[in-house]
Amino acid sequence: MGFPRNDYLTAARAQNHSDDFISETLSYADGLDCKGLPVIFDQHHLSYLLYMEHRELKQFVRSASGYYKYFAIKKRHGGLRRIMSPYSELRDVQTWIKENILDKIEQPIYVTAFAKGRTIMENARMHEGRKYILKVDIANFFESIGVRQVYVAFKKM
């Protein structure tokens, strides 16, 4: 799709934005656009790209836990693993982010989980012949990640 640079310039000038502001925002936009990533200026802009109301997007952020159904499955070696499955509205947003952003970011070779085109066999090959393998299961991993951490991770892209 590409960032509509000329349309942005016309609109920014019509809104009397300073040359410095326009230059900074174009630099930001060009950095993302050249990587094939969508340009997102703020939550309002993201909601526009997602074809949803801004208030709905804000509600996802404010009370994310309310957009998941919870259930448990048995672990191989006893105990239960809590599963959080997003309802369709949130899943649609997550899918858009995955397809339009995350799938376009090249992952380091050692990242295999959830990396497009990588398999569990590739992960196993990296450990072949090793004397020790450390297996870690971090309790409540996804729940422990806050909005600020997500913002910082995406900002670095």
For the regions a language model picked out, list residue spans one by one.
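Non-catalytic, polymerase-adjacent accessory regions of viral genome-replication enzymes
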Residues: 1-58, 64-66
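Nucleotide/phosphate-binding site architecture used for ATP/NTP-dependent chemistry
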Residues: 39-43, 48, 81, 88, ...
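Generic solvent-exposed, charged/amphipathic alpha-helical segments
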Residues: 47, 94, 98-102, 151, ...
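Reverse-transcriptase-like RNA-dependent polymerase core
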Residues: 57-76, 157
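Short, conserved non-catalytic motifs in the polymerase core
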Residues: 71-94, 113
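Active-site-proximal segment of RNA-dependent polymerases
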Residues: 90-140
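Glycine-rich, acidic/polar active-site loops that bind/position phosphate-bearing ligands
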Residues: 140-157
